Every structure is written in structure tokens, then in C-alpha cells.
Amino acid sequence: MIMKLSDIKNGNLSAEWAEKGYELPKFDIEAVKAKTHAEPTWVHFGAGNIFRAFPAAVLNDALNSGKYDRGVIVAESFDYEIIDKAYQPYDNLSLLVCLKSTGDIEKKVIASVTESLKADYSFGADWARLVEIFQAPSLQMISFTITEKGYGVAPADLERGLTPVLAMGKVTALLYERFKAGKLPLTVQSMDNCSHNGDKVKAAVFAYASKWVEQGLVPAEFLAYVKDETKITFPWSMIDKITPRPDAKVQKMLADDGFEDNYTIVTEKHTFTAPFVNAEETQYLCIEDHYTNGRPPLELGGVLYCDRETVDKIEKMKVCTCLNPLHTAMSIYGCMLGYTLISAEMADEDLRSFIQKIGYIEAMPVVVDPGVLNPYEFIGAVINRRLPNPFMPDAPQRIATDTSQKLAIRFGETIKAYEARGLDKSNLILIPLVLAGYARYLTGLDDNGQPFEISTDPLLAELQAIVAPLKVEAGEQDFSCLKALYSRTDVFGVDLYAVGLGEKIESMAKELFAGPGAVRATLHKYVKAR
């Protein structure tokens, strides 16, 4: 049997698809489409894989519950080929392939996207439709997965008047249409993986609105409108889900099923997309519940709504304790030990114990507990399900990018918390070992003494110059150069000597530099002792 997304019409193929393990929508697709077209409630900017795998899938679950009846309209402001090649040929349907660490796979057709539009003035009909949607009193929320860079504001774009080319400029132009339609309320919601993401959207919108007022292009009341929290809000959120580019193994599995829409699409802008999207099973989306015109009931699909302080606590729990520090520890040592997959590292007993003990023994005593998510359950999912997942082709080399910019938040905050609470810092053994490993990593030599490619980093040349006098060899060396590294508060968040850890880290670094095999031997020694 050949299966194609375009064949799906309100579940009349359900028996055939179910035989192959494909879950079809339980709602009337055409009815939801018609209702959404007439009374739109949600527009999402960013038509990439994370949107289809997470926000759109959450809404699909809400629609399947029978307790909601509107879909989401997706708008793409950067790579318009995604709309032409991955959405419209398939009636805006897509297949979500959920990859579990057990090796099990779930396949679900996502039908919550009712329209797909190119967010640019050069596409006249699409832009006119976006203006019409923004003028609709029914519109409750616009949201984004455009990456942190998407919130950038370029001086040149601010000079383009009411036809900017960057995403935030276009959104501000559409907000101006909503202002002219009667100062209608709306919530502007970032769903990107960056701290205090709502503030990034807010700053960008305010920048455009302020400039346009200054240039006399819009009335001062427009700036007052976007700043009025009874009209426009910019809530924070925390999102966490890994959605890799389309995977060849998944592609083959779908082809073997007879699912015809299984090919990868690479756009001219080098976006990797497909009619299907593969993603990990674990996911978290926590949103500050600060809406001015109502909102879609995404809690029906598992979204957690809370206050701003709680969103911030969840972010800190993840970034400072339960996920990001473990990632960085694995990236530094994984690169030196020759690994290219995080999942493969999890089969290495030394590395697995390394991150378990960093998380549970050293970081957890000062974890920020948000109350609504259990830190122990969160880190348990990371260690037992997420990192070992063989379907997640994540590499230590990717995670090692910009390490100098990550160490302060991922480890420095824990050290500061030990200081603030008067805890005994001599209990910190493996976190110092991570930081000692960073000096060894900067040499660009693996544990066999062979060169490896160090990931890009803005401070790379500067920090490599500090460790340049050191050799990876047995025998006496002068390690005093490390003082210039480990006293840098810009890199580590604290002066490691001032907090009493510098000498311990230096001592560990000496062991790591003691010739080929020293990285493995030192790691094993300290992990076992812990």
C-alpha cells in the first residue's frame, strides 16, 4: 500500500494507516480549517522543524481532545521555499516521527496547521492575508521559533521605514495594522530556546516602533500601544526539545512502510526539511500566563502555564544544573576521547558516571527548584532517556561550540551558589575536573596525542595562547600559565583562585597533560573516587 499525506481526508483511510502504526487526526480537518480562516486565533512565525514537531503537535493533541476547534496559521519570514516545498504540496499536513530511547517509534499525522504564508511584501496575496489576520479581533497570540538571531535589529533595517526586511520589523509593521484596526489586544510570544526570550521580542518591537515615531511614520500612540500591557504582552517561556534535521534511517523506515512522502528537501538557504519531522520523545514547554485577549488551550497538549518567576526558575534549573552542564562536560571530554555521538558517550561507563555524579552529587544540592517540575525527574529523563537515545545524532563537537561563553552560567553559577550558602567547596571534585579538562581541550590534541578540530569560539585564539606553553607529555612542566586562564571571571563567572578552587583545578590539569592516555586515566580516577 502506498501512503501519501495528500490522501488524508478526515480519517477515511484510518484503518489502512493504523495497520502500519500511523495515528491520524481525530478531528474534522476541513471544519477546523474553515473556522480558523474565518476567526483566526494564532499565527506562528518560523515554519521550521521544531514548530511542526512541538507547538503544532501540541495543538494537534488539543484538537484531538475535542475541546478546541481552531488551528494555527504558520508564517515564514526567512526561507520561503519551506512553504513552497514542505507545506503547500501536502495540504499543510506533516508526519511527526517520535524517536524513543527504547528504539520504539511513534508516527502521527499533524493536521493543526490550516494555512501557510510567506511573510513578505513581495508575496502580495500572502502579505494581504497576514494584514487581514492581524486586523481580526479574534487573534489572540502570535508566536515564534526563529532562533535567537531572529530577534536581531540592524541599524540599516530601522532606516527602511514601514517595509523592513528582518522578522521583527515585519512583525512590528503587522502590529501597526492591528493598532489601526482599533488598538486591538494581542500577546506576542517567543517560543525560542533562549533565556528571557520575551524581553528579546519586546526590545526589538520597541526599537522599530520608537524609530518610526521618531521618523514621523507612525503616531506616538502606536509606541504607547505596544508598551501598554493591557493591550500587548511579551511573556517569557522555556522550551526544550531536540529536533534534528531529517534522518536517513527514518527516511528508509518510512519508505519500507510505503509512506511515499519520505524525501529530504534542502532549500537554497540550506534549510533541511521534509514532509516528515523526526524528534525526541521528551519535551517541555513552560509559558508565562500573561495574555490580553485569551489564548489557545495548549495545556490540553501538555504545555505548562505559570508565572514569570517560575519560568525563570525552570530555565535556571535546566541551564545551571539538569541539562546544560552535563552537555558541556560530555562535549569537552567526548572530543578528547574521540567520540562523535553523545549517545555513544553514554555507553562509556566513565563518561556516564561522570555526568551522573556532576548532576546528582555536585550540582543538585544548589539546584533552583521551580516547584512545578521536579528537578530529579528532569535530570533522570536527561540521563536515562534523552542523552542515550540512539536516534538523536547530536555530537559533542556541536555542543562544544562557544564553550568559553557557556562555562560561567553552566558551572560558575553552581560555584557561586556554594559560596552564597556557605557549603563546603571541597565537595566539588568533578566540576573542577570539567574546568581542568577545558585547558587540555584547548590544546587541540586528543587523548592519543592526535590533532582534532576544535569547535568555533570567539575567545579561542586568546585562550589557546594562554595554554600554548604546555605540552602533552610526561615530566615536569611549569603550569603557572594556567593562572591567567582560571582567574578569568568573564569565562568562569568567578575567579577560581579567589573561591579556593584554582589550585585543585591546576593539579588536575597537570594529570590530564601527562602524555597519551592521561585524559582517560584521570577521568577514571576521579569518577571512581567520587
Segments (PLM) and residue ranges:
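Substrate/ligand-engaging "lid" and interaction regions
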Residues: 2-45, 49-530
